[in-house]
Structures are given as C-alpha cells and as structure tokens.
Amino acid sequence: KGANERYCCDLEKVKKAIAAVKQGLTSLHPGDISTTQNPIIFRPEQQAAIDKTKKVFRRGNQMLWNAKMRFGKTLCALRVARDLEMKRTMILTHRPVVDEGWFEDFGKIFYDRPDYHYGSRTKGESFKALEYLASKGDRYVYFASMQDMRGSELVGGKFDKNNELFSTSWDFLIIDEAHEGTQTELGKAVIEELTKADTKVLQLSGTPFNLLDEHSEDEIFTWDYVM
C-alpha cells in the first residue's frame, strides 16, 4: 500500500526529486532544498583549527581538537573535509543520536557542492548508493555508530556485518566525542581496522584527557571558553 502523506513544495523541487529517483538516490542534496544558504564565516579560533589541521595533514595523519562545547567542531571538521577534497569521509561516534546534527551541518558546508553526499542508516543515502556515486567521481560523508561497528565479527564482535565499511579505503576518519568508547579493546580494534596507511584521523573532544598522550603538541588544537 502506498504512502498518502502530502507535502507543500514548488514545481522545481518536484522536478529535482523525480530526477533524483531516476538516478537511484533516496534524498535530495541540501543545495536542491534550500536556495537561501550563504557560506559560513568562521570565527578566528575556528579558522585557526581548520588551518592548523590542514597543515598537519600535509605531513602527518593524526590530529586532536581539544575544544569545549559551542566551539563548532562539527562544522569545522566538515570544512576540513571540503577544503582537502576528501573523497571518502567517515564520521564515527559513540553517540548515534548526533546523526541529525551532522546531517544538518553537512547541508551548511556542502550546500553548493552537489558532488558531495551524506549517508547513514537513517539519513541521506545508503552506503551502497554512496559507493556507486563515488565510482562516478563524486565524494561522500558517511556517519557510523561505534556501538554498531564494535559488534562486527571482523573486530571481535558477535555479528557478521559492516564488512564493506571496514574494507573501504577511507581518506578521512572523524571521531566525534573521541574520549568515549574508543579506549576499549573493541573500540581500538574498530579504529585500527578503519585506518588505512593514508587515512587522515581527526579526533574531536571537549575532555580528551585519555587521548592527550597519544599526540604530539603539534597535533593538538586547544580551545576553552576563556581563550
């Protein structure tokens, strides 16, 4: 039985939705939904984090942002992905509820880049669709739950799942709330399996006390409310 929901929209969005379905997509790109988006002007401290990370990634693969809440870590991390033209980016977090926030911020950063797509189990495109788009030259950001990834047989879990995620050559791995769920045996195994030789890893945390020893001073950006 078909759905009977009705939504108000203009003719152009209907045309774009039909075109998206013909391409095998399950959602419109954020740029096709809103026509009022403007580029985000980052605060000086945010731009400093972005610039330092790009500089570090030119010679290394690891970066940690020690930044308190309200800094804007999500937007800034996505800006790094955009500036460096990352083809395959994974967002890994112990808090799957933040998928909505990442999806919204993706639209703010990539609204004018139709070659970038977002996917997760609940938002945007499926992983299969994203890989198809990547095979055509597009780029994507995929959101994954640490809890789900830890359950995979490949890293010592109990379920035969996520093999396609682990076998993907990720260009960029963003670990959100990196102080949570990453220091257990399974958590470390997940990160190790996802991180290939050339994968850039950016860890985000407001309280990264269990992570500081893993990074050199040059690989850490710090921001607090009093700075």
Where do the language-model regions lie?
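Conserved pre-motif I regulatory segment
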Residues: 31-66
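Walker A/P-loop
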Residues: 58-80
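Short basic/glycine-enriched coil/helix segment immediately N-terminal to the Walker B
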Residues: 59-61, 135-139, 155-172, 196
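Inter-Walker segment of RecA-like/P-loop motor cores
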Residues: 111-155
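SF2 helicase catalytic motif II
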Residues: 146-149, 161-203, 207-209
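Non-catalytic accessory segments flanking enzymatic or RNA/DNA-binding domains
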Residues: 2-40
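Interdomain hinge/linker at the junction between the two RecA-like core domains of SF2 helicases
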Residues: 217-227
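Conserved Walker A/P-loop ATP-binding site and its immediately adjacent core
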Residues: 74-110, 148
